[in-house]
Amino acid sequence: MAEITEQELLQQIKSKKFSSLYFIYGEDVYLRQKYVQKLCKSIVTELPEMNMPKIDGKNATLQRISDEIYQIPLMSDMRCVLVEDFDVVAAGKESIDELELLFADIPETTVLIMVFNSVVIDKKKSGWNGVVRSASKNGCVIDCKYKTDGELVKYITTWAKRRGVVIDNS
């Protein structure tokens, strides 16, 4: 796949045609949380407590992530593994290589969501550049940038209109 836009992500969620990997980062906290919530809710519809493990990346190992990914879904079609703030670059080159291999071998019944809330992704650094490139090759990368003023006006106007309220742009 590749780096995708907000519209492409929302279309995947609507059509329920998911990638095996979502790599979500960026400066807009609201968008990151919104996308993760929408993905998780849409992927796992049965027994979320069993099919949607949440892993705190600060205390996680690649082995733990791998173990969760390779478990089969229980009484559900899909399993969603959510990993927050896993700083693989700080773990070293060997961990980066292992993670890249893991990205390429995610089972069809599992969706891995890696979201970075406090870990800063600097694509200029070679470690993160390789990880983002591998994520892009094997799944979807979403960079949650702040919206421009024009985009915000359009978003808020549309949001209000759906709720029966009209907002004047002046």
Question: Predicted regions span which residues?
Answer:
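Conserved beta/loop motifs at nucleotide-recognition and modification sites
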Residues: 1-170
